[in-house]
UniProtKB/Swiss-Prot annotation:
The modification Phosphoserine is found at S134, S202, S222, S258, S488, S512, S567, S672, S689, S740, S744, S765, S833, S854. Residues 146-164, 282-293, 330-339, 346-361, 398-413, 872-893 have a biased composition (Polar residues). Interacts with BAIAP1. Interacts with actin. Interacts (via PPxY motifs) with WWC1 (via WW domains). This is Synaptopodin. A motif (PPxY motif) lies at residues 549-552, 568-571. It is found in: Cytoplasm, Cytoskeleton; Cell junction, Tight junction; Perikaryon; Cell projection, Dendritic spine. It comes from Mus musculus (Mouse). Expressed in brain, namely in the olfactory bulb, cerebral cortex, striatum, and hippocampus, but not in the cerebellum. Also expressed in the podocytes of kidney glomeruli. In the hippocampus, mainly expressed in the principal cell layer of the dentate gyrus and Ammon's horn. O-glycosylated.
């Protein structure tokens, strides 16, 4: 391993080419290949895994065949840039071994994104990431479609006999398990399985995954325990678990990419944020593994490399977990343990060797750097730092912004000493690319840079950092060139506020593996200083977040990263999320505000609707009035234009309305003495009608009292009907017109009239009563009449039935008996008649009502014949009905043809017209009522 790592000078050399090596396109191809290999090549599962691992570690397919030293040498070339190593470390930190594979790929990305150690190359490489992302995005889409198809096939025929389906099922199960691991749900089981199996899923870069898991357990346990986990498994064990995690990472990346596809930034973020998310998930897994299964890491304690890594890996913890667990060769781990002497050269070598074989090796240099920087830190401190790093790494995976959260978590998670070491890691994380501690100490900047670069790599793994830089760039948070390095520093600044991140630029320049290695021996001091300086700050701010961070980091790794990927707005949300909670809260708060806006708009709409409803109601009310006015005007016009005969004809032909209008003209005929009124009637008649009606009212009242006393049970039962009839009694002439309508509407018309014949009038009166009520003094009476008639309808119907046959008899008898009274009463009605006709015009309902009462006299007699027939007919009909009926009968003969009811109504109208008995008609109705 050392020999393999010593090629680091090539790493330094390859840093220049690191950008080329870390082509975003290779990353995209790697991801696509990984996804495709996992999803589509069930038969080539192992080969695909190896191929994926190779792509991750080497950024090429060179390491597919060679998982050993040659891939290691290649890997250094790919990952040689310190940024690559950092990223690999970040991958280890954020995600366990599987995430390290991603990290290796990301290391290339970092090199492309962040160039070598300087931000400018990163900027230049970002476009490459964007391009490769487009390709990768397409590949991811294709892989996703394939996986979906495969999943659908597998789901539909779970027990299918086809070999392909079986292979897919196996592959799917494996992937699901890995995915769960990446999510941190099944990491313990996978770790145990990997330990038990001990088979290298992919010789290259698989160890980091298992190592990450041990590191996660190491978090709860002593630093040594996490590293032993990988030793117990051995290189093969680490590779197996790492590969499984890599597969899970690939699955996770696929999912993330699918999620990220939603937003244009997704293309860029898929490579960056997707891998970061997967890494963060692996870190969450490792955390869960640590918490749930710290013993397996203890079991792995035997590996000295892991122990060594953990001692120096407080910064490594996130990444060191990968390095320690993933260090296939214990010597490398030992080198890590010896950060001052061996680590300085070895970190480069180990980073190269580790990156090439494990993909962790690359991160291992970062680990070594961390070890150098942190080797002075006590084992407890290192262990705590590992725990912190794990926590931190998960949040950074979620987002570079969350790196602060992770840093506080680490600081709060371990003791004060641990906080220092974790602070070192935290510093690395906040300054992921900046390596503020390294930068702070210029002599140690290079050395610390590797350690912090490792943490930075973790943030870099949370490529959201670089992505965030692009998006955050508008906010002025980070410059696109130094996005990775400065992003975490900026985030770190927000976290710590105190720390000056000016060094980050130098740290970027110092990231070259060799300088970093040399500095790595010094970095522990610098990092310690930074930790001593910043750890309190980290503790202060993140302490509130410390407890939630693991879950929060997991949540962030799964969701917040996706949100970042989804849109710059999410980044803006993340901008405040430099404090992990605030960013998350902001993301949530914004939707809440939007929801409130929607509710407000809905409320406004509701109020508008209510207003419209109010408008509608008033409209409904005036319509009846308008109808009444129109009816009255039409009646007046008809009265003027049409003669009595025409009036009679109309009711038969037209119906109730026509008869009503004709009745008004009949009233005019009655009022024929007042020709002026005919001219006046439309308006003046309206005014006069109330006067005239007022005169008849008292008469109807008397008649009503009589009718109630003498009349049928219906009238006696309800005096209100009698009152209505009294009001309507004025319109007896119009009632004559009612017969035809009564035929059509016998019930309503009949019942409306108190008198048996009044039903006709009632029908007319209700139709016109509104106008009469509106225009006439009757108005209250008419209004009462309207509702009451509806109630009285059945009763009036009865009188109408009774009145049908008796109408003729009572009409004749009453005509004779009433002849004497009619002249006298007629005189007064005639005197009033001039006005009355106008009133009829205005209040056709009243005259109508009046008319039917005259015929109604026979009706009450009819109804009363059944009930009180003899007395009622004799008393009431003789008074007024006889003349009305005699006159009505002659003209009403047509109405008679219609029916006895029709006969009744025409009688009053005719009697009033022919004999000028309008007064008689009025009198009979009044007398009858």
């Amino acid at each position: 391993m050392l020999g393999a790592h010593f090629p680091p000078p090539p790493l330094g050399a390859s840093e220049g080419r690191a950008a080329p090596c870390t082509f975003q396109i290779p990353d995209g191809s790697y991801r696509c290949l990984a996804l495709e290999a996992e999803e589509s090549s069930s038969e080539d599962g192992l080969q695909g895994e190896v191929r994926l691992v190779d792509l991750e570690e080497e950024g090429t397919s060179q390491s597919r065949a060679n998982h050993g030293t040659p891939p290691l040498s290649r890997a250094p070339a790919i990952i040689q840039p310190s940024s690559c190593h950092r990223e690999a470390r970040g991958g280890f930190q954020r995600s366990d071994r599987p995430s390290h594979d991603w990290d290796v790929v990301q290391a290339r990305k970092v090199m492309t994104a962040s160039g070598s150690s300087s931000p400018v190359p990163r900027v230049a490489q970002k476009p490459a990431l964007g391009r490769s992302t487009s390709f990768t995005e397409n590949d991811l889409k294709e892989a996703k479609a394939r996986s979906q198809q495969i999943a659908a096939q597998l789901t539909t025929p779970p027990s299918s006999n086809s070999r392909g389906v079986q292979l897919f099922n196996r592959r799917r199960q494996r992937v699901n398990e890995f995915t769960l691991e990446s999510r941190g749900q099944r990491s313990p089981k996978l770790n145990q399985e990997a330990l038990q199996t001990g088979r290298p899923l992919s010789p290259i870069g698989h160890a980091p995954g298992p190592s990450v898991k041990p590191t996660s357990p190491s978090k709860p346990g002593s630093p040594k325990h996490p590293s032993p986990q990988s030793p117990s498994r051995g290189v093969a064990g680490h590779i197996m678990e790492g590969y499984s995690e890599e597969a899970s990472l690939l699955r996770h990346l696929e999912k993330v990419a699918s999620e990220e596809e939603e937003v244009p930034l997704v293309v860029y973020l898929k490579e960056n944020a997707a891998l970061l998310t997967a890494n963060g998930l692996h870190l969450s897994q490792s955390r869960e593994t640590q918490q749930s299964s710290p013993n397996p890491p203890d079991t792995e304690v035997p590996s000295p490399a892991a122990d060594i890594n953990q001692n120096p890996s407080s910064p490594n913890a996130t990444l060191t977990t990968l390095a320690s667990s993933s260090h296939h060769s214990q010597p490398t781990a030992d080198i890590n343990q010896n950060p001052p002497a061996a680590i300085t050269p070895v970190p480069q070598n180990s980073s190269q060797a580790q990156c090439s074989p494990n993909g962790t090796l690359d991160s291992k240099p970062g680990t070594l750097c961390a070890d150098d920087g942190q080797s002075p830190v006590p084992a407890e401190e290192v262990r705590s730092s590992i725990l912190l790093i794990d926590k931190v790494s998960a949040p950074p995976s979620a987002a570079s912004t969350f790196s602060r959260e992770a840093t506080p978590l680490s600081s709060s998670g371990p003791p004060a000493a641990d906080l220092m070491s974790s602070s070192l890691l935290i510093d690395m994380q906040p300054s992921t690319l900046v390596a503020p501690a390294e930068q702070e100490v210029p002599g140690h900047v290079a050395v610390t840079t590797p350690t912090k670069v490792y943490s930075e790599v973790h943030l870099t793994l949370a490529k959201p950092a670089s992505v965030v830089n692009r998006t955050a760039r508008p906010f002025g948070i980070q410059s696109p060139g130094t996005s990775q390095i400065e992003q975490s520093p900026m985030m770190g600044r927000r976290q710590f506020g105190e720390k000056a991140w000016a060094p980050p630029a130098s740290s970027m320049a110092d990231r070259s593996p060799q300088p970093q290695r040399h500095i790595m021996s010094r970095s522990p001091m610098v990092e310690r200083r930074l930790l001593g300086q910043r750890s309190p700050v980290l503790e202060r701010r993140p302490l509130g977040n410390f407890t939630p961070p693991p879950t929060y980091a997991e949540t962030l790794s799964t969701a917040p990263v996706a949100s970042r990927v989804r849109s710059p707005p999410s980044y803006s949300t993340l901008y405040p999320s430099s404090d992990p909670k605030p960013s998350h809260l902001k993301g949530q708060v914004a939707p809440a505000n939007k929801t409130g806006i929607l509710e407000e708009s809905m409320a406004r709409r509701g109020s508008r609707k209510s207003m419209f409803t109010f408008v509608e109601k008033p409209k409904v009310t005036p319509n009846p009035d308008l109808l009444d006015l129109v009816q009255t005007a039409d009646e007046k016009r008809r009265q003027r234009d049409h003669g009595e005969v025409g009036m009679e004809e109309e009711p038969f032909a037209l119906g109730a309305e026509a008869s009503n209008f004709q009745q008004e003209p009949i009233a005019r005929d009655r009022a024929s003495p007042a020709a002026a009124e005919e001219a006046v009637p439309e308006w003046a008649s309206c005014l006069k009608s109330p006067r005239i009606q007022a005169k008849p009212k008292p008469k109807p009242n008397q008649n009503l009292s009589e009718a109630s006393g003498k009349g049928a049970e219906l009238y006696a039962r309800r005096q209100s009907r009698m009152e209505k009839y009294v009001i309507e009694s004025s319109g007896h002439a119009e009632l004559a017109r009612c017969p035809s309508p009564t035929m059509s509407l016998p019930s309503s018309w009949k019942y409306t009239t108190n008198a048996p014949g009044g039903f006709r009038v009632a029908s007319l009166s209700p139709a016109r009563t509104p106008p009469a009520s509106l225009y006439h003094g009757y108005l209250p009476e008419n209004g009462v009449l309207r509702p009451e008639p509806t109630k009285q309808q059945p009763y009036q119907m009865r009188p109408s039935l009774y009145a049908l046959s008796p109408v003729k008899e009572p009409a004749k008898a009453s005509s004779r008996a009433t002849s004497s009274r009619t002249p006298s009463r007629t005189v007064s009605p005639r005197a009033a008649s001039p006005a009355k006709p106008s009133s009829l015009d205005l209040v056709p309902n009243l005259p109508r009502a009046g008319l039917p009462p005259s015929p109604a006299l026979p009706r009450p007699s009819r109804s009363s014949p059944g009930l009180y027939t003899a007395p009622v007919q004799d008393s009431l009909q003789p008074t007024a009905v006889s003349p009305t009926y005699s006159s009505d009968i002659s003209p009403v003969s047509p109405s008679r043809a219609w029916s006895p009811r029709a006969k009744q109504a025409p009688r009053p109208s005719f009697s009033t017209r022919n004999a000028g008995i309008e007064a008689q008609v009025w009198k009979p109705s009044f007398c009858f009522k």
